[in-house]
Amino acid sequence: MRELVCPKHMCKTPMGKCMEWDIDEITGQKVQCQEKPVMSTTLYWCSKCNVPMYEERCPECGSKGEYIATDIRPVFPEEKVLLALLLNKEDPLCFEEASVWNNTNYYFIDGERLQVSIKEFNGKSLEEIKAIKAKYSTCVSEIDYTKFDANIQKFIEVNQNRYNEVTDEAINFVQGYKDRYSLENMFVSFSGGKDSTVTSDIVRRAFSSNKVYHIFGDTTLEFPLTYEYKKRFGREHRVLPAKNYEKNFENLCKQIGPPSRVMRWCCTVFKTGAITQTIASAFKNKTNILSFQGIRHNESLSRSKYDRESKSPKITKQTVAAPIIEWTDFDVWLYILTTGIDFNDAYRLGYSRVGCWCCPNNGAWSEFLSKVHMYDQYVHWREILVDFAKKIDKPDPEEYVDQGGWKARQGGNGIDIAERSIISYEPCATEDNAFNYELQRPITPEFYELFKPFGYINPHLGNERLGEVYVLDKKGKVVLVLQGRIGSTKLKVTIKNERLAGATSLKVADGKIQCQLTKYQMCIGCKACESVCKHNAVKIKELEDGSTSYKIDDEKCVRCTECVNHYNAGCYVRKVLTIKREG
């Protein structure tokens, strides 16, 4: 059973918002709560049919169910074997005939709840895990799916009403875009996970077509089983790969540190930028593309705030539609198992979510499974993390890594490139609107590309001997004067128009200049700037010598300055590597 409730009062919200009354802490007046409702789910267990169900009374046998959980996922035979080994069962196949389901730290075996300690499992030594894997490998070949398949068939029959309800609603939602977008102006964001798999199938059914593009963001960190599934999927769907061929994940970890829960730079560098380029290539100069995504509210706290339709915060030319946004894991698996569509075999191993296998957002269970099923890759990744911990002078690097300290890391303290975020300057003594900067990178001809968002570059109006370059607005008026010789680190900037790029004061205008100077000093070619430009004006690529080329197309740039203002201090890497500053 599902219903919208107020997260504060846990009451029903038939009007679409909470109507309960609160006392305002400041005024002492009575005010209506009006909290945005969230979806609450109640699932039951039918002891006769031996399956979880959505309705309190079983549609098949009429039995009244017992409450079991708010969400649940099936446990496949492969995970059953691993569970038996972890519980030290004599027979690793002892759960073969049982109906086994999972909800985070709880397994439900024929309706009986079994609590397990994921922390304890993940705390096992690598040698212990290696021994478990050896036993698992000998047993897994003996798995018989017969009983599992029969149990799943009963699950499907019992929950047929729920399947029809969520499927019909999602298909109708997708069909609502028929008159607003053509098939040539839309795509499915495909990750190889269960949610994008279901979303893809719903889109196919809604439009009765396999012609919709699928963009697969290859972070280079996907599970091996994801690549296998993507290959199968590509035989029946139009899949466009999106991959950053210029960057290497391990090299970037050494340069700017591993991604953390707070700053998952890997998504921007290896997914967002690559997908932006693929969209630009596939959809040319179109500025409003529809992307169907498998976002769901109950995946995480951050996603619980997403709207069903929204403008993408990362890729600005993209409208995002989420057909299954209110679905639970229960609903997703009900759809997959009912339709019989192919899915990623990583779920059979016990993964509840499939993304990057070493993601800092992965839970302890996913981390443990990677130790079991990707032992060599995990050991190598751990060595990279330990080396990083030593580099930033952690007192006990191995404990820092094993206790997950790297996942909570914030900022760039201890990382060399973070020092480039510091902008040294002082106001000019003779001109109130001028500033003298000491750059950490010598001025090159490409330096002036970063000032194109402010206007049109003219290197001929100024004193060439002094290295003066003028920036003009569209009427030909001077808005900036840049003075600095090629090869020098000294730069003088004179702001001729305090309203530069929508600035409200000289200080704000100078802040926008500093955004671009920071970008010039810190750019590693992450392509975040490309992603925020909906006009395809920004082009970034890595050159053969390892340096980065940053170009802005004068013809395409509309001087909106989104590439200047979008990220804190103008640069995504600067945002990732924030450091404590003196003073």
PLM features per residue range, with description:
Residues 527, 536-537, 561, 570-571:
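Glycine-centered, phosphate/nucleic-acid-interacting loop/turn motifs that mediate DNA/RNA or nucleotide
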Residues 524, 538-540, 551, 555:
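A conserved regulatory-domain signal marking ACT and ACT-like small-molecule sensing domains
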Residues 1-189, 194-517, 542-550, 558, ...:
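Nucleotide-activated chemistry modules centered on ATP-dependent adenylation/adenylyltransferase
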Residues 134-136, 531, 536, 540:
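Long, mid-chain structured domain cores
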